[in-house]
Amino acid sequence: MLTYDTWEEPAITFPEDDSYKGALSVLKWAYGHYGDQLVYACSFGIEGIVLIDLISKVKKDAEIVFLDTGLHFKETYETIEKVKERYPGLNIILKKPSLTLEEQAEAHGDKLWEREPNQCCYIRKILPLREALAGHPAWLSGLRRDQGPSRANTNFLNKDDKFQSIKVCPLIHWTWKDIWRYTSKHELDYNILHDQGYPSIGCEPCTSPAFTAEDLRSGRWNGMAKTECGLHE
């Protein structure tokens, strides 16, 4: 089994010229290789909706983890409920941080995300995902290369030093237009905030409409020297 400890640049190739740009081939390999040990950490943005639909073609009872920070838009929770209705076999887990927002405010001060967003992300996202991935050799992510400069070199299979795991990214060759074409063709429900100028959706206090079409994550952490929550750095 390919794991963090046995990692070598994989001699595995996936076709990129099919209608899925390699995504379905990657998923079939990943679930065939890891089975129930493979976890999808999903934010339920538009890429996540597409990837869930593809996953459902391969493993109808896949485990999907949502990092429930307690700060998400209500529209995000509404999207999760729609996904549950469409794919009743999926095992969707809402993973909460060990600290409630009240406990975090007591320990670190109110609205930590405004003063120390990196620490807030660490408490409410990184630590919970680390717990969720414990004992799992690999996880899925919906990263795409054209989401921004920090993701341009993502591969199908990646050695993930942060979580000491293998990060599998089936959608790396999909463009923003590919995502929306697939969504429309298959009539997938998605977060309505995408129709209101939010191409990338995270926690409500740290998410604004995008400022530029060239960087779909330009609406995240507005005014701060920060473009990632830390999960993919």
Swiss-Prot record:
This is Adenosine 5'-phosphosulfate reductase. GO terms for biological process: cysteine biosynthetic process; hydrogen sulfide biosynthetic process; sulfate assimilation, phosphoadenylyl sulfate reduction by phosphoadenylyl-sulfate reductase (thioredoxin). PANTHER family: PHOSPHOADENOSINE PHOSPHOSULFATE REDUCTASE. Pathway: Sulfur metabolism; hydrogen sulfide biosynthesis; sulfite from sulfate. Belongs to the PAPS reductase family. CysH subfamily. Coiled coil: none annotated. One of its GO terms (molecular function) is adenylyl-sulfate reductase (thioredoxin) activity. NCBIfam families: APS_reductase, cysH, PRK02090.1. [4Fe-4S] cluster binds at residues 120-121, 203, 206. Catalyzes the formation of sulfite from adenosine 5'-phosphosulfate (APS) using thioredoxin as an electron donor. It is found in: Cytoplasm. Keywords: Cytoplasm, Iron, Iron-sulfur, Metal-binding, Oxidoreductase. The active site is at 229 (nucleophile). It catalyses: [thioredoxin]-disulfide + sulfite + AMP + 2 H(+) = adenosine 5'-phosphosulfate + [thioredoxin]-dithiol. HAMAP family: CysH. The keyword Oxidoreductase applies. Its cofactor is [4Fe-4S] cluster. Binds 1 [4Fe-4S] cluster per subunit. Its EC number is 1.8.4.10. It is an enzyme of class 1 (oxidoreductase). One of its GO terms (cellular component) is cytoplasm. It comes from the Bacteria. InterPro entries: APS_reductase (IPR011798), PAPS/APS_Rdtase (IPR004511), PAPS_reduct_dom (IPR002500), Rossmann-like_a/b/a_fold (IPR014729).
